Amino acid sequence: SHHHADWDPTLTAGNIPLLENADLYDGPGVQLADNTEYCVHARFCMARGTVWQLTEDSDNTEAHDLAVHESMYCPSGRLKLWDKEEEKFYEPPLKPALGLIEDPQEECSGPLWVKGGIPVNGPNGTEYEQRNRVTLCRCGASANKPYCDGTHVTVHFQDHLPLSTELEE
């Protein structure tokens, strides 16, 4: 994909834990941590009401359950929902895997989705925070590399790979 992109390999993300720069949103029984330096363009957090509003309304069982679901399936891990009673984050059990994210709504190619705690290391040996969910920049334009910040939408990044429905078996 980098043959088709104006790729700048400079890593720009600070090696700061995700939660350190997160904004906190309180709801009854839960607290949402949101680090806006990371991509939100997958829109899983907006599937059935926004996760921010669902957190605020989480005294309603359906809103609570949707807030849990929407936050856990944020590919970048930008959103983390804290259960105040259990004193732990809701986090899906993901096996180590890689995936490519495509954005048909914005008609662009998105980041590399890294799941299941696969370590991310820089070329000089820098070890980034190991997380269950993270998205890595493929377009070369993120201001938070190696992480995706959603700039692929602005630059209309195209990886020119066939969609899965077009792949030959």
Residue spans for each PLM region:
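Short, structured motif recognition centered on aromatic/hydrophobic residues
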Residues: 79, 112-114, 134-137, 147-148
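Iron-sulfur cluster-binding cysteine motifs and their immediate structural context
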Residues: 1-8, 40-58, 69-86, 145-156
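Short histidine
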Residues: 12, 143-169
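Short linker/helix segments within small regulatory modules
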Residues: 57-68, 131
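Ferredoxin-type iron-sulfur electron-transfer modules and their immediate structural context
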Residues: 1-44, 48, 95, 107-110
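Polybasic, low-complexity binding patches
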Residues: 3-18, 62, 85-98, 159-164
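Intrinsic, low-complexity N-terminal interaction/targeting segments
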Residues: 101-126
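Short Cys/His-rich zinc-binding micro-motifs
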Residues: 37-39, 136-142
